[in-house]
Amino acid sequence: MLKFLSTKCKQFNSLNHIIKHKIYFPSKSNKSYFSSSVKDVEKKNKEPIIQLTNDAINKMKEINLKYKNSKALKVCVEAGGCSGFQYSFSLIDKNKIKDKEQIVYDKDCIVVIDKQVIDILKNSKIHYINNLISKKFTIENIQNISSKCSCGNSFDIDFV
């Protein structure tokens, strides 16, 4: 859920308005879409909402090897950061995915996103950076960005 920041009240309310009217709900016939079966997810989601680079896929394979193929990558977007909004990543159990979350299957990993932020993250790309400075997942090509912070995790959105 997006957190309220008083300094970004207008943008936050606009984002909620956009999210409220463009939210994606899978049909009731897609009950298996939220099951813990990776094969069901693969069949239901042929067009991924988010792309993953090979580095990101390989990192998730490495993580799932360690955790016996039980983890999914959760992407969150919330109000905050230097530029207005920020994204973060966490690992969640595949069998604890909630109905308010959307599953995106891409090759050998599962990415989970709150349904509220699908339009913000649609057509973006998750990458994994592994260098001397940091080891982390990042998101590239987020649509409608008006500005970005040098930290790479914070951005502002143009509300159309």
From Swiss-Prot:
Listed GO MF terms: 2 iron, 2 sulfur cluster binding; 4 iron, 4 sulfur cluster binding; iron ion binding
One CC-aspect GO term: mitochondrion
Pathway the protein takes part in: Cofactor biosynthesis; iron-sulfur cluster biosynthesis
Gene3D superfamilies given in the database record: HesB-like domain
InterPro entries according to UniProt: FeS_biogenesis, FeS_cluster_insertion, HesB-like_dom_sf
Location relative to the cell: Mitochondrion
Keywords: 4Fe-4S, Iron, Iron-sulfur, Metal-binding, Mitochondrion
Any single biological process term in GO: iron-sulfur cluster assembly
Protein family per UniProt: Belongs to the HesB/IscA family.
Function: Participates in iron-sulfur cluster formation (ISC) pathway for iron-sulfur (Fe-S) cluster biogenesis. Can bind iron and [4Fe-4S] clusters. May function as an iron chaperone.
Stored NCBIfam families: iron-sulfur cluster assembly accessory protein (TIGR00049)
Subunit and partners: Tetramer.
The protein's name in its UniProt record: Iron-sulfur assembly protein IscA1
